[in-house]
Each structure stands twice: as C-alpha cells, then as structure tokens.
C-alpha cells in the first residue's frame, strides 16, 4: 500500500510539471530560418517579402511570400533577389501614394455678414 502511494504521488508531481511545460506558448520569439535556398520564382507570383537577419539563424535570407501564401527562401546576395526586393518596394510605394489622401488648394472664401440695421 505504501509503495502505491509513493508511486501515485510521483505520478501527480510528474503530471504537474508536464502540464506546466505544455502550457508554455509555442514559438515564443522563435525566428523563421532558412537552411537552403530555392531557385528563382516568377515575380508575378510574389506578393511580399521578409528579411531574416536573426542571430539565431545560421545565415541571412529573404523569404518571399507567394500569392498562394507559400514561403520561398532566397539568398539575399543574388541579383534576382535584390531586383525582386527593389520592385516589390516600388510596388508598395506606389500603393501608398495612390491611397494617400489628395491634398487640394485651400478655397478662398470670404464670409461677410450684413448689418441688420442697414437692410435694403
């Protein structure tokens, strides 16, 4: 009986520690890293990118996000990658400029009030 009580106590302690470990949020501050690079993909399939410069990753990389939300790792030193980044930045800038509110010249309106005593 004493043996089973000790065993039960150990199981309860283990379950407590396991539940504490499992309660930790997944992926806290874990960067996305690229370990291999993909070949060039068509620019028309790319909608955005992210630079990976974390010290936790073995190498710097660029992750392109496709229209189908797939991530493609690329070497930032390759010319096609640099060209894509420049074109995507240009696209983003154009979108920001087209959605910015248009400013117009101020209207020169002069408000005048009539003197109630001087009504004609």
From Swiss-Prot:
<feature type="disulfide bond">
    <location>
        <begin position="34"/>
        <end position="73"/>
    </location>
</feature>
<protein>
    <recommendedName>
        <fullName>C-C motif chemokine 2</fullName>
    </recommendedName>
</protein>
<dbReference type="InterPro" id="IPR039809">
    <property type="entry name" value="Chemokine_b/g/d"/>
</dbReference>
<feature type="compositionally biased region" description="Polar residues">
    <location>
        <begin position="93"/>
        <end position="120"/>
    </location>
</feature>
<dbReference type="InterPro" id="IPR001811">
    <property type="entry name" value="Chemokine_IL8-like_dom"/>
</dbReference>
<feature type="glycosylation site" description="N-linked (GlcNAc...) asparagine">
    <location>
        <position position="97"/>
    </location>
</feature>
<feature type="region of interest" description="Disordered">
    <location>
        <begin position="91"/>
        <end position="120"/>
    </location>
</feature>
<feature type="modified residue" description="Pyrrolidone carboxylic acid">
    <location>
        <position position="24"/>
    </location>
</feature>
<dbReference type="GO" id="GO:0030335">
    <property type="term" value="P:positive regulation of cell migration"/>
</dbReference>
<dbReference type="InterPro" id="IPR036048">
    <property type="entry name" value="Interleukin_8-like_sf"/>
</dbReference>
<keyword id="KW-0964">Secreted</keyword>
<dbReference type="GO" id="GO:0061844">
    <property type="term" value="P:antimicrobial humoral immune response mediated by antimicrobial peptide"/>
</dbReference>
<dbReference type="GO" id="GO:0048245">
    <property type="term" value="P:eosinophil chemotaxis"/>
</dbReference>
<dbReference type="GO" id="GO:0008009">
    <property type="term" value="F:chemokine activity"/>
</dbReference>
<comment type="similarity">
    <text>Belongs to the intercrine beta (chemokine CC) family.</text>
</comment>
<keyword id="KW-0202">Cytokine</keyword>
<feature type="disulfide bond">
    <location>
        <begin position="33"/>
        <end position="57"/>
    </location>
</feature>
<keyword id="KW-1015">Disulfide bond</keyword>
<feature type="signal peptide">
    <location>
        <begin position="1"/>
        <end position="23"/>
    </location>
</feature>
<dbReference type="GO" id="GO:0019233">
    <property type="term" value="P:sensory perception of pain"/>
</dbReference>
<dbReference type="GO" id="GO:0006954">
    <property type="term" value="P:inflammatory response"/>
</dbReference>
<dbReference type="Pfam" id="PF00048">
    <property type="entry name" value="IL8"/>
</dbReference>
<comment type="function">
    <text>Acts as a ligand for C-C chemokine receptor CCR2. Signals through binding and activation of CCR2 and induces a strong chemotactic response and mobilization of intracellular calcium ions. Exhibits a chemotactic activity for monocytes and basophils but not neutrophils or eosinophils. Plays an important role in mediating peripheral nerve injury-induced neuropathic pain. Increases NMDA-mediated synaptic transmission in both dopamine D1 and D2 receptor-containing neurons, which may be caused by MAPK/ERK-dependent phosphorylation of GRIN2B/NMDAR2B.</text>
</comment>
<keyword id="KW-0145">Chemotaxis</keyword>
<keyword id="KW-0732">Signal</keyword>
<dbReference type="GO" id="GO:0051968">
    <property type="term" value="P:positive regulation of synaptic transmission, glutamatergic"/>
</dbReference>
<keyword id="KW-0873">Pyrrolidone carboxylic acid</keyword>
<dbReference type="GO" id="GO:0005615">
    <property type="term" value="C:extracellular space"/>
</dbReference>
<keyword id="KW-0325">Glycoprotein</keyword>
<keyword id="KW-0395">Inflammatory response</keyword>
<dbReference type="InterPro" id="IPR000827">
    <property type="entry name" value="Chemokine_CC_CS"/>
</dbReference>
<dbReference type="GO" id="GO:0070098">
    <property type="term" value="P:chemokine-mediated signaling pathway"/>
</dbReference>
<comment type="subunit">
    <text>Monomer or homodimer; in equilibrium. Is tethered on endothelial cells by glycosaminoglycan (GAG) side chains of proteoglycans. Interacts with TNFAIP6 (via Link domain).</text>
</comment>
<dbReference type="GO" id="GO:0048020">
    <property type="term" value="F:CCR chemokine receptor binding"/>
</dbReference>
């Amino acid at each position: 009986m004493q043996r089973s009580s000790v065993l039960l106590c150990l199981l309860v302690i283990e379950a407590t520690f396991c539940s504490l470990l499992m309660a930790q949020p997944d992926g806290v501050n874990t960067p996305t890293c690229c370990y291999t690079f993909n070949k060039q993909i068509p620019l028309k399939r790319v909608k955005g990118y992210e630079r990976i410069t974390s010290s936790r990753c073995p190498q710097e990389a660029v992750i392109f996000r496709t229209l189908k939300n797939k991530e493609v790792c690329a070497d930032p030193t390759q010319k096609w990658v640099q060209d894509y980044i420049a074109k995507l930045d240009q696209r983003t800038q154009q979108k920001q400029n087209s959605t910015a509110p248009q400013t117009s010249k101020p209207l020169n309106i002069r408000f005048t009030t009539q003197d109630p005593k001087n009504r004609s």
